[in-house]
Structure formats: structure tokens, C-alpha cells
Swiss-Prot record:
Binding site for ATP: 19-26, 45, 137
Listed name of the protein: tRNA-specific 2-thiouridylase MnmA
Region spans: Interaction with tRNA: 160-162
Protein's gene: mnmA
Record bears the keyword Ribonucleoprotein: no
Location relative to the cell: Cytoplasm
EC number: 2.8.1.13
């Protein structure tokens, strides 16, 4: 008979390691599993210690959060361990985050943290402790497939779904992971936390970029990659200089505010050129992309990636965490993988993830994904160039 974690055996005979960040989600996960009778062990990773960030609302895995996780563990009566992963986190997440921004990308550090730290190192530690599974407080689900392996599926609460950040999870990792909150809403989680008497029941949610003390990511990038703060030109699609900026790190594709340029029509950041330090801007129409070239593709669908793609695989893709999946085709071209967006997308930014799904809504299955290497517009976007010609600047400014 299978228990609530889809495992053979009684809960009391099943050890579960819970990744406890100190927030309400992971704390409720630990309390819920303990209440169901599992042998629960809590582990918190100390990922950074940046002074101001320790007490900042929305920080994660710093001093106050470690204290909160320990308090919850004592409340529910489970052993709790803190592992120092600052060095690993700095190398795998913070350094790569800064490098990505310096090369004109807009990275998603949570994906790298899950891939390199939580679902690799912590998973190994859980196995060493004799755990049957590692449970987390992510809003996502998994289900058993006919062959006994597991599929990653979206959370029941679409507004809280975190599947975008977990696309890089491997099949082996999925078999060992469990997500008890996948069928809950956030209000239900908080209510459950209150019923367990957890002090974190009303604690603020953590921020995506948890390691940025001031909330200004450019401070972190500027310290690690000073060249990203070097000034350069803001130009239109024809290369005409419209203004100056103080570092490409201050910009991302699709950005409209803070350009420091007055024009007859709104201008948007279309691309960043780190080699020339140019920020290319233009009309919204020029943001529309329909082809995306991917790197570091991870496949967790059926069969192998090459076999699944064949001459082309119809699917749905999400190019930013806040957007709904859109219809697309995945193709293998000259040894690389390319996504063709049927309706196109605005603001497709290199460094972001393009995540694959088998359906546009509901508890769709996650098929994998990759990081956006580059994007191309429809037919060179001649119409957008025409619109750009009409946007004669009224004054040039400096982006600070």
C-alpha cells in the first residue's frame, strides 16, 4: 500500500528530509509531514550573510530565516541541521548571476540555485541521512507514470505555480523529490500553518533575488563585474545615437522606463550589446519575436529529446515566469534547438528560461526547457524599422 508520498511503507518507517528555508511554505511542509507520522528531518542551507539582508523582509536563507526554521523545528519536534553552503552558493549562483548580467543577459538565479544547490547537493545529503525522499515547499506537483518514474506538473494554483523555476530538474532528481503543497493555495497553506501554531504563518514571502542586500542587483553586479558599469551609447535600430547610459547592467529587454530619452512615441530596450556597450532601443513592434535559440536544454518528457522532437514537436512554452504558456514548435536545427512561437512574444530576453509544457493551462506536465541564447523577429521587422524612423528624439538624456 502506498502512503501519502506515493511510497511503499508506513509513514513512521519513512524518513523524509525537508528543505526548510525559514518561510511559511517549507515550514508548513515539515509540520504537515510530521503530523502525518513521517520521520522528518529539517535541513536549512546558509547561503549568504550580507549584513543588511539578514533583517530585510523578503530575504531568504540568511540569519533571521535560519532562526525561524530552527524555531519551527523545535515547535513540531523534529531534528534540524544548518549546512554552510555560502562558498558553493557564491560560486554557482552569485558569480554566474553577475557574469550573465555583464554579458547582456537577464538571468534567473532561482533556477541555478535549484539546479546546483538544492536539487544536487542537498539531495545527496538527504540520501546520506537515509531519507526516502526530499520534500520542499514549492508550489508544483509530481505524479507517477506507468513505468514508475515521475512527471513534473504545474501546481493547482496557477497564480502560485513555480514550475518555471524547476525545469532543469532531472528525471533522477524527480524520482526522489516530493512537493506536498502542490494541490494547495497560498491562503490554505497559511491557514494550515496557523493550525499548527507556526510563528511564520504570516511571514512575508521571499524575493526571487534573495542575496541582494539593498534590492538593487546592479550593486552586486557592479562589485563583481565592474565592466558592466562602463558608460555607452543608447542607439536606435539604425545605429543613431539617442543618448548615453552608465552601464548595460541597468537595462533589460522590454524595459521602457528610465531610458532618459524623450521621443514622440514610447521606446523600449530591444537588445544589449556588451561588446560595444550599446543599448539598442525602438518601438514596441520591434520587441515581437517568433524564433528563440536555446542553450543547455533539459528534457524530462517521454523518450529521449531527439526522439521526441523528430521533425518538430508541438508544445506550449513560457518565456517568463509571469506569463502563461503559449503555443510553439520545438525543432532541432544544425545541432541546436530552436523554438518557433506561433503567435510571437514581446520582450524575449537572453538569459531567461524557455520552459516546455504539454498544455496551456491546468496541471500541465513540464517537458523540460532551456535558457534563451538569442531571439529573432518576424521577417527582420521592417514595419518596426519604419516606426522607429518616426520616433525622432526631442532630447537626449543619461541613464544612471
Amino acid at each position: 500500500m502506498l502512503n501519502s508520498l506515493d511510497l511503499e511503507g508506513r509513514p513512521q518507517d519513512t524518513r523524509v528530509v525537508v528543505a526548510m528555508s525559514g518561510g511559511v511554505d517549507s515550514s508548513t511542509t515539515a509540520a504537515l509531514l510530521k503530523a502525518e507520522g513521517y520521520d522528518v528531518v529539517g535541513i536549512t542551507l546558509q547561503l549568504y550573510d550580507h549584513g543588511e539582508a539578514i533583517h530585510r523582509k523578503g530575504a531568504c536563507c540568511a540569519g533571521q530565516d535560519i532562526h525561524d526554521a530552527r524555531t519551527v523545528a523545535e515547535r513540531i519536534g523534529i531534528p534540524h541541521y544548518v549546512l554552510d553552503y555560502e562558498s558553493r552558493f557564491r560560486e554557482s549562483v552569485i558569480d554566474s548571476f553577475a557574469t550573465s548580467y555583464a554579458t547582456g543577459e537577464t538571468p534567473v538565479p532561482c533556477i541555478e540555485c535549484n539546479r546546483s544547490i538544492k536539487f544536487r547537493d542537498l539531495l545527496s545529503t538527504a540520501r546520506e541521512l537515509g531519507a526516502a525522499v526530499l520534500a520542499t515547499g514549492h508550489y508544483v506537483s509530481s505524479r507517477r507514470l506507468p513505468d514508475g518514474s515521475r512527471a513534473l506538473v504545474c501546481a493547482a494554483d496557477a497564480d502560485r505555480d513555480q514550475s518555471y523555476f524547476l525545469f532543469a530538474t532531472t528525471r533522477e532528481q524527480l524520482d526522489f523529490l516530493r512537493f506536498p503543497l502542490g494541490d494547495m493555495t497560498k491562503p490554505q497553506t497559511r491557514e494550515l500553518a496557523r493550525s499548527f501554531g507556526l510563528s511564520v504563518a504570516d511571514k512575508h514571502d521571499s524575493q526571487d533575488i534573495c542575496f541582494v542586500p539593498s534590492g538593487r542587483y546592479s550593486d552586486v553586479v557592479g562589485r563583481l563585474k565592474p565592466n558592466a558599469m562602463e558608460p555607452g551609447d543608447i542607439v536606435d535600430l539604425d545605429g543613431r545615437v539617442l543618448g548615453k547610459h552608465h552601464g548595460i547592467v541597468h537595462f533589460t529587454v522590454g524595459q521602457r522606463r528610465g531610458l532618459g530619452i524623450a521621443s514622440h512615441a514610447p521606446l523600449y530596450v530591444l537588445r544589449l550589446e556588451p561588446s560595444t556597450r550599446r543599448v539598442v532601443v525602438g518601438p514596441r513592434a520591434a520587441l515581437r519575436m517568433d524564433r528563440i535559440l536555446l542553450r543547455d536544454v533539459n528534457w524530462i518528457g517521454d523518450n529521449s529529446l531527439d526522439l521526441a522532437v523528430g521533425d518538430g514537436l508541438e508544445m506550449f512554452v513560457r518565456v517568463r515566469s509571469t506569463r502563461r504558456p503559449q503555443p510553439a514548435w520545438l525543432r532541432a536545427i544544425d545541432g541546436e534547438y530552436q523554438v518557433e512561437l506561433i503567435a510571437g512574444e514581446d520582450g524575449v530576453s537572453p538569459g531567461q528560461a524557455c520552459v516546455f509544457y504539454d498544455a496551456p493551462e491546468g496541471q500541465a506536465r513540464v517537458l523540460g526547457g532551456g535558457f534563451i541564447k538569442s531571439a529573432a523577429p518576424r521577417a527582420a521587422n521592417k514595419d518596426a524599422r519604419g516606426a522607429a524612423a518616426a520616433n525622432r528624439p526631442l532630447a537626449a538624456g543619461v541613464r544612471g
